[in-house]
């Protein structure tokens, strides 16, 4: 995969957290699925869920033995972005650093392009 340009980055910190969560669930078939839906205060919302399946057309990114999955419709809004994880005063969460977002809400959960 070194010859292929990956349109989305899956950080080491996020991969490590996913690995921990998968171990807690005791299901090694789980993958982190990232998706975009309409809604939120800025028009689009990021979503994260665990999924055992990879659908036709999904893009997968491997890091530290775990897999990130993105459907083609969501990927078009995430190109050049980075899936990451943070722990802070407001709690812990996965987030996306998205260069395509022209505006984001205060919590970073929704955006517009």
Swiss-Prot record:
SUPFAM superfamilies: HesB-like domain
Residues annotated for iron-sulfur cluster binding in this entry: 41, 105, 107
InterPro entries recorded: FeS_biogenesis, FeS_cluster_insertion, FeS_cluster_insertion_CS, FeS_cluster_insertion_RrpA, HesB-like_dom_sf
Keywords annotated in UniProt: Iron, Iron-sulfur, Metal-binding
The keyword Transmembrane helix appears for this protein: no
Function noted in UniProt: Required for insertion of 4Fe-4S clusters for at least IspG.
Record text on subunit structure and interactions: Homodimer.
Family statement drawn from the similarity comment of this UniProt entry: Belongs to the HesB/IscA family.
Protein's UniProt name: Iron-sulfur cluster insertion protein ErpA
Designated gene of the protein: erpA
């Amino acid at each position: 995969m070194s010859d292929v340009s990956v349109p989305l980055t899956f950080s080491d910190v996020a991969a490590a957290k996913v690995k921990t969560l998968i171990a807690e669930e005791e299901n090694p078939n789980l993958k982190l699925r990232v998706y975009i839906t309409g809604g939120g205060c800025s028009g689009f919302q990021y979503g994260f869920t665990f999924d055992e399946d990879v659908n036709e057309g999904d893009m997968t990114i491997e890091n530290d033995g775990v897999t990130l999955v993105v459907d083609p419709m969501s990927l078009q809004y995430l190109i050049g972005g980075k899936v990451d994880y943070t722990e802070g005063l407001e709690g812990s969460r996965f987030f996306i650093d998205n260069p395509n977002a022209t505006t984001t809400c205060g919590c970073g959960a929704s955006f517009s392009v």
